[in-house]
Amino acid sequence: MAKEKFERTKPHVNIGTIGHVDHGKTTTTAAITKVLADAYPEENTAFAFDMIDKAPEEKERGITINISHVEYSTPKRHYAHVDAPGHADYIKNMITGAAQMDGAILVVAATDGPMPQTREHVLLARQVGVPYILVALNKCDMVDDEEIIELVEMEIRELLAEQDYDEEAPIVHISALKALEGDEKWVQSVIDLMQACDDSIPDPERELDKPFLMPIEDIFTITGRGTVVTGRVERGSLNVNEDIEIIGIKDKSMSTTVTGIEMFRKMMDYTEAGDNCGLLLRGTKREEVERGQVCIKPGAYTPHTKFEGSVYVLKKEEGGRHTPFMDNYRPQFYFRTTDVTGVIKLPEGTEMVMPGDNVEMSVELIQPVAMDEGLRFAIREGSRTVGAGRVTKILD
């Protein structure tokens, strides 16, 4: 069967759910797709809760690990939705997922209010550059007391203001579960939530005029057709049958031709900044490419190992280190979709860096990463995020 073509008729926005484990992020995602599928059946399909929550690992522990993409449309826009991981161990994935959001829905259970991971996700959203947040106050059907809801709202607004988000951001009272069950009042609450997304997240400005760049998130083989790399196009555009170069991580770059482009299982003639898509590569073996490399217009960007960065070191309460670190500290640096070990050099006269500090540092990575000034990264050790920063100067 020939694949249908993806139609670009509306502005395309990448959105996601973030927030504390068990506050209902995945249920909210499922409710949005169901309510929109019922309201606008010609342009939406409902995604069941267990289709979204589909990583095998998380079934055992009831936590979302992988990042699931679903799509839906309002009358005004087409949305690609990332269900971001909710568990502390998997903040690594939060970093790879959230870097792709034009806005985020922060899901907070009215029964609990903001929890430690709520705070951590908002901090991370700020550090990885999610520009707008609005709030789905979930499980409102379980709280009768208006005063409790008002207190929770105040706490949420304080939390948003702490990270320089709009403290006047919309807070929409929902019950994702009741909406899934078809309760009219709560179905309307999800429609209101999407109206708030349409109104409060501006149409993103895509970096269309720059040369093509797409970080590789995943790689798989289609029997008889070849290797497909998937990711979100960060810059520029690409047509079918154009050549690309794949750079970073490995010692030498590789050139190939893109023989097909797919988005949401539909074939496309071209792809542009903001799209989540798959590129079919001519004559490329799966083992020749890896996550963390980037596909680029040949010669447009170069990989580097040495840079200067401006870094915020997380406090203990934010999930960071309990103790300071010294010169020559060797953590992992997460760029876009991958982590690379690097050695930190502190500025002259700085003996150590305390949790909570802002610091300028130079870094030498053990593998090259395609980067330029302004690129954001997170610093991790083991499962813990210990800092977040951006590249201020390329050294080599």
Swiss-Prot record:
Predominant location: cytoplasm
Region spans: G3: 83-86
Gene Ontology molecular-function annotations: GTP binding; GTPase activity; translation elongation factor activity
Source domain of life: Bacteria
Region (G4): 138-141
Subcellular location: Cytoplasm
SUPFAM superfamilies named among the record's database cross-references: EF-Tu/eEF-1alpha/eIF2-gamma C-terminal domain, P-loop containing nucleoside triphosphate hydrolases, Translation proteins
Keywords: Cytoplasm, Elongation factor, GTP-binding, Hydrolase, Magnesium, Metal-binding, Nucleotide-binding, Protein biosynthesis
Heme recorded as keyword: no
Region called G2, residue ranges: 62-66
One Gene Ontology CC term in the entry: cytosol
Enzyme Commission (EC) number: 3.6.5.3
G1 as annotated region, ranges: 19-26
Positions of the tr-type G domain: 10-205
Chain residues that bind GTP: 19-26, 83-87, 138-141
Similarity field: Belongs to the TRAFAC class translation factor GTPase superfamily. Classic translation factor GTPase family. EF-Tu/EF-1A subfamily.
NCBIfam families per record: EF-Tu, PRK00049.1, PRK12735.1, PRK12736.1, small_GTP
Oligomeric and partner information: Monomer.
Function recorded in the entry: GTP hydrolase that promotes the GTP-dependent binding of aminoacyl-tRNA to the A-site of ribosomes during protein biosynthesis.
Protein name: Elongation factor Tu
Organism annotation: Corynebacterium aurimucosum (strain ATCC 700975 / DSM 44827 / CIP 107346 / CN-1)
Gene transcribed to yield this protein: tuf
